[in-house]
Amino acid sequence: MQLQLICEDAALQPYLDAIASKWQLTHDAHSHFALVLTFERLELRKLDEPKLGAIYVDLAGGAVAHRRKFGGGKGQAIAKAAGLNKGATPTVLDGTAGLGRDAFVLASLGCKVQMVERNPVVAALLDDGLTRAKKDDEIGAWVSERMSLLHASSHDALAALASDAEFVHPDVVYLDPMYPHPENKKKTALVKKEMRVFQSLVGADTDADALLTPALALATKRVVVKRPDYAEWLDGVKPSMAIETKKNRFDVYVNASMS
């Protein structure tokens, strides 16, 4: 993928070169998007809209830390959807990892989470955030133990893993495809910013319907699909049950009981 690759300090250039090589990113001086390496972190910026600010992954602080501490634990909707309220601590494959927030919530509640992200820029941001989180005194130990990242398209990876005799199937496959956002729907400033940047960089997941069948083949217990409250069912398939919040809905497709 091509975008501007910028270092805030020349001393960081070898590190940025390594990131570009790892994620197959090439510099394009004319791109409106820039991946910027600072001394603190890796950031994505939309240069033609500087007021949007930088997008980066911070699993140790900010809103993510607040949600971990005060978000409701196993009683919150995502935990119920994944079956944690049944007394289980399932293994999870997050097929649309994005910036890793939902995966982090599940990991903070004890789940081992394998994250899959197909966009190389998003994967680079997530990898950087994960690396920093693993060094954090408070959360580093369990993040290292429970969270891992695979850079691949779930459209390929889910089917490939399902047919791999040596791969241990996860209890739960979690999907949160990017969905076109109607202008008349309100979002928080942060989500609005991220959606604007991501949808112009990545585009909506117009092929998301094709994820459900391989996800059901891979998950031993259930597939959880996060949808906006106004969205139709993934691939038009009615879920076994749905858990609703103010703005979202978790559609749950049950393969087997959690016990």
Swiss-Prot record:
It is found in: Cytoplasm. Pfam families: SAM_MT (PF04445). It is an enzyme of class 2 (transferase). It catalyses: guanosine(1516) in 16S rRNA + S-adenosyl-L-methionine = N(2)-methylguanosine(1516) in 16S rRNA + S-adenosyl-L-homocysteine + H(+). Keywords: Cytoplasm, Methyltransferase, rRNA processing, S-adenosyl-L-methionine, Transferase. Its main location: cytoplasm. Its EC number is 2.1.1.242. InterPro entries: 16SrRNA_methylTrfase_J (IPR007536), SAM-dependent_MTases_sf (IPR029063). The keyword Nucleus does not apply. One of its GO terms (molecular function) is rRNA (guanine-N2-)-methyltransferase activity. GO terms for cellular component: cytoplasm. S-adenosyl-L-methionine binds at residues 101-102, 117-118, 153-154, 176. Belongs to the methyltransferase superfamily. RsmJ family. Specifically methylates the guanosine in position 1516 of 16S rRNA. PANTHER family: RIBOSOMAL RNA SMALL SUBUNIT METHYLTRANSFERASE J. HAMAP family: 16SrRNA_methyltr_J. This is Ribosomal RNA small subunit methyltransferase J. It comes from Vibrio vulnificus (strain YJ016).
